[in-house]
């Protein structure tokens, strides 16, 4: 495909000239290297002045501690403009006083590279659209331009067949003057010739294009990529890596002499997202996907997702954090899962006062009246008319489809009680003596599943699909088994 994006999982090198924005005539040769894992390194022949000096007197300077960092470094390489952002010198070698005079060298690390444009920084509104590809986006889209036909004769394969292409209409949704468009890009058939075989190929790539009403900056594009990445991570119930990110530059469309419109110039972004997508790895099993665009149409889902993610961002970040970077110790995961549940309950704005406000004020006044003046401030801070963690967990369990919850959590009250006890013991005592490791793991997985079901419920996932997920999804089935083994009250308590 023409204008192929630069994939974040593929390494690359760009040899060119590099300079600081304030000194465009002082250009240094060097090589920019990208390691295919999110790391960027610029090796210069020569060096930008990173030392910090204080002028003591005319012709007299004193070198201070620390070193300079550069927000932006510009470059040109392979007939493309390059902007490096967040640049820090990590090694400089100078030849002052050396026996053999040779060029200085310097190595600079950068957080982000824009290949194809010069911009003044992360806040520069230089882009009109972004296009994003994320792992397993094709599976979630539940559509393809490709189809296959196998010929048969009398019900027996006859050796004939065909792969055909039929373009798929793009799906779009507009949210607060921002257009999200789910589209396919495909190649026509081509051949890989080798000495031992010939392989015919066709490619279909799914991406989401985000177009803003007004020119936007890089930080807005990165947020759009994160929004898409989080959606696919939720849908696939696993860490979803960004495969590539391209930006369309403002004001670069042109009219050709024959009347055709030349598309806008594009720039590739190389950076380190939460997870780097592996473009050539095997797709996940379709049975692992919680929902697709067949179940929740793209046009309806995107407005809901933008709204839900906006109000439940903290809870979603914490619960997805258990997928992107699960801690090796169950205690960390316990705090993360329960914290996500608390943040979710607050974000949903469903909090109910345990005691009527007027009655609570009377009780509080009476209690504080019995406390000595010097301790009254401490007691005043601790007396609150807020739901407990147990109340919040019970409220969350009451929101999704109750048949799904019943299959997932055998005894909701016991789960809420044991989860509250475990979190409080860990947070306030530093240990959980009344819980085994297996029970803590069951609490983490069950609480995480309840949070996820709540988010899916907010997105409008039908009750039937919620039940199917609990019954059929491999990880949810395992969570159910753990809950039924560890989160049921002993017979003596029942």
Regions from the PLM with identified roles:
Residues 46, 259-494:
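Amphipathic, oligomerization/interface secondary-structure segments
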Residues 202-295:
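Internal metal/ion-chelating core segments
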Residues 3-14, 22, 34-48, 52, ...:
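Short, charged N-terminal helix-start/capping segments
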Residues 1-239, 469-472:
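Long, contiguous, compositionally biased segments that the model treats as domain-scale units
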């Amino acid at each position: 495909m023409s204008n192929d994006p630069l994939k974040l999982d593929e390494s690359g090198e760009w040899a060119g000239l590099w300079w600081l924005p304030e000194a465009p005539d002082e250009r240094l040769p060097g090589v920019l290297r990208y390691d295919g894992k999110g790391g960027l390194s610029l090796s210069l022949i020569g060096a930008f002045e990173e030392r910090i000096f204080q002028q003591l007197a005319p012709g007299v300077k004193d070198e201070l501690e620390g070193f300079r960092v550069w927000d932006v470094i510009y470059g040109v390489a392979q007939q493309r403009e390059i902007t490096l952002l967040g640049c820090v010198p990590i090694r400089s070698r100078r030849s002052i006083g050396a026996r053999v005079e040779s060029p200085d060298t310097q190595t600079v690390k950068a957080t982000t590279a824009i290949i194809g444009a010069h911009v003044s920084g992360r806040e520069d509104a230089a882009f009109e659209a972004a296009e994003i590809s994320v792992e397993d986006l094709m599976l979630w889209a539940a559509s393809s331009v490709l189809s296959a036909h196998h010929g048969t004769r009398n019900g027996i394969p006859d050796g004939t067949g065909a792969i055909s292409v039929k373009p798929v209409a793009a799906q779009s949704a507009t949210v607060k003057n921002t257009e999200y468009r789910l589209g396919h890009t495909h190649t026509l058939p081509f051949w890989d010739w080798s000495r031992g075989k010939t392989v015919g190929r066709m490619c279909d790539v799914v991406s989401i294009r985000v177009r803003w009403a007004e020119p936007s900056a890089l930080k807005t594009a990165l947020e759009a990529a994160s929004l898409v990445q989080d959606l696919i991570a939720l849908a696939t119930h696993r860490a979803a890596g960004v495969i590539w990110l391209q930006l369309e530059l403002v004001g670069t469309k042109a009219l050709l002499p024959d009347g055709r419109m030349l598309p806008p110039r594009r720039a590739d972004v190389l950076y380190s997202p939460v997870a780097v997508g592996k473009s050539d790895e095997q797709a996940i099993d379709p049975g692992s996907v919680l929902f697709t665009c067949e179940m929740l149409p793209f046009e309806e889902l995107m407005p809901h997702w933008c709204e839900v993610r906006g109000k439940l961002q903290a809870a979603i970040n914490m619960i997805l954090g258990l997928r992107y970077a699960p801690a090796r110790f169950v205690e960390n995961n316990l705090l993360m899962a329960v914290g996500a549940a608390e943040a979710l309950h607050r974000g949903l704005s469903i909090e109910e006062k345990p005691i009527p406000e007027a009655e609570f004020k009377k009780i509080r006044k009476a209690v504080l009246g019995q406390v000595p003046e010097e301790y009254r401030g401490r007691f005043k801070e601790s007396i609150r008319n807020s739901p407990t963690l147990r109340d919040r967990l019970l409220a969350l369990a009451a929101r999704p489809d109750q048949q799904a919850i019943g299959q997932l959590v055998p005894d909701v009250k016991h789960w809420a009680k044991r989860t509250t006890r475990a979190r409080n013991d860990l947070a306030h005592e530093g240990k959980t003596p009344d819980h085994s490791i297996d029970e803590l793991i069951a609490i983490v997985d069950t609480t995480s599943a309840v949070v996820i079901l709540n988010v899916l419920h907010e997105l409008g996932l039908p009750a039937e699909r919620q039940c199917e997920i609990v019954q059929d999804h491999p990880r949810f089935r395992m969570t159910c088994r753990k809950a039924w083994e560890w989160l049921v009250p002993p017979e003596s308590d029942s």
